[in-house]
């Protein structure tokens, strides 16, 4: 096989195309993985529209699992036929951040099939910018993790998303028996956070999203944690300007929530959720919301609030998820709500953008 099907962007979000390109050959330090399952995330299209991709044309996608199809001459610890997940976060491996389990802060960090996080020279990203929404992907050998036999390819393809939820929960520094608010709770990050909450001692959940029926479905993932829902479409029409969401959160948690895990990509939810945080509590944001906060520095000072931004998980966060899956302490098959063939990748992208139906974690199977 000399060519493969891949989902490519040529200039921006309006120029996606499914096309045949050459199957990659491994360099000395590479492996080539035959992709069995690849995750699909709406943030890709947003970043394309923002012009955040440094190399175009490129193959999209940053979450994948499959089997090793080829091994470079200097690659160690991996063999043809191994079941693996691809850890597509590129970093230098030598800086202070990489050496202290903070590799997502590395100045060189970027994501295959996604975007770079700053404008500096990034030789690894230059070499490995092509992503995983294809039949094969070339990746440095040190960025594949062995996949336990008990973990299926579809779930393995979403380990990075679950690792991001683990990272957000860690940043929240939750006490045992905590109350947390999860915004955008019906998406991939929200559903992963609900699923993982019991592993972080959460005692009460408050889920925020647009529609009650979708929120109630996500509440079923909590493993028995008491869960309340706040449907934005049930708030007064002027909630965005009157602070009605803040008021509702305070009704449900009169003393305030210990933390808000906020995955909203735009709008006033982030700021209003911040007002529902208890004194000394934390809002962890991983939604890319560009709407300014309503709170003043004085409000943060007087309430001793922490606002923590996070852009990715660490490698160890992802490995922690794999261990939970391997031992059975975490099950995640029910999170995979949609499966698309690679031949329908354009339709899959459209479905993810529209979200006409409940969708937690969609995957593409080449």
Please place each PLM-identified region on the residue numbering.
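Glycine-rich beta-strand-centered segment in the early N-terminal region that forms part
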Residues: 24-38, 50-99, 103-104, 148-150
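NAD(P)H cofactor-binding loop motif with strongest signal on the N-terminal glycine-rich segment
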Residues: 184-185, 288
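Hydrophobic/small residue at the entry helix of a nucleotide-binding pocket
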Residues: 164, 188-189
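Glycine-rich phosphate-binding loop and adjacent beta-alpha segment
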Residues: 202-203, 219-225, 264-329, 366
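NAD(P)H dinucleotide-binding glycine-rich loop of Rossmann-like/cofactor-binding domains
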Residues: 92-181
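C-terminal hydrophobic helical "lid"/dimerization subdomain
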Residues: 1-4, 271, 315-366
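Adenosine-nucleotide cofactor-binding segment
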Residues: 182, 198-268
């Amino acid at each position: 096989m000399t060519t493969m099907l891949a989902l490519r962007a040529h200039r921006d979000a309006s120029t996606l195309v499914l096309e045949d390109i050459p199957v990659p050959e491994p360099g000395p330090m590479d492996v080539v993985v035959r992709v069995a399952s690849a995750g699909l995330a709406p943030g890709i299209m947003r970043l394309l529209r923002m012009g955040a991709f440094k190399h175009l044309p490129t193959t999209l996608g940053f979450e994948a699992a499959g089997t090793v199809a080829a091994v470079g001459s200097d690659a160690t610890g991996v063999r043809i036929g191994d079941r693996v997940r691809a850890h597509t976060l590129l970093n230098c491996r030598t800086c202070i951040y990489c050496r202290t389990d903070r590799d997502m802060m590395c100045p060189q960090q970027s994501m295959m099939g996604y975007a770079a996080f700053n404008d500096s020279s990034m030789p690894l990203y230059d070499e490995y910018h092509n992503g995983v929404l294809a039949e094969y992907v070339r990746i440095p050998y040190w960025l594949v993790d062995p996949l336990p036999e008990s973990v299926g390819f579809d779930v393995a393809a979403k380990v990075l998303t679950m690792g991001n939820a683990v990272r957000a929960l860690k940043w929240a520094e939750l006490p045992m028996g905590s109350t947390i608010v999860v915004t955008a709770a019906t998406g991939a990050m929200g559903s992963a956070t609900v699923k993982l909450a019991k592993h972080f001692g959460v005692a009460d959940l408050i889920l925020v999203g647009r529609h009650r029926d979708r929120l109630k479905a996500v509440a079923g993932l909590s493993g028995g944690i008491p869960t309340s829902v706040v449907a934005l479409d049930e708030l007064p029409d002027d909630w965005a300007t009157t602070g009605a969401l803040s008021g509702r959160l305070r009704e449900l948690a009169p003393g305030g929530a210990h933390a808000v895990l906020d995955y909203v990509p735009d709008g006033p939810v982030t700021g209003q959720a911040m007002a529902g945080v208890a004194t000394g509590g934390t809002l962890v944001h991983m939604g890319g919301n560009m709407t300014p906060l309503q709170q003043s520095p004085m409000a943060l000072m007087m309430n001793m609030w922490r606002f923590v931004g996070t852009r990715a998980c660490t490698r160890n966060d992802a490995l922690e998820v794999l261990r939970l899956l391997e031992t059975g302490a975490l099950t995640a098959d029910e999170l995979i709500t949609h499966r698309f063939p690679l031949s329908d990748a354009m339709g899959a992208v459209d479905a993810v953008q529209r979200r006409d139906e409940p969708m937690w974690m969609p995957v593409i199977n080449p």
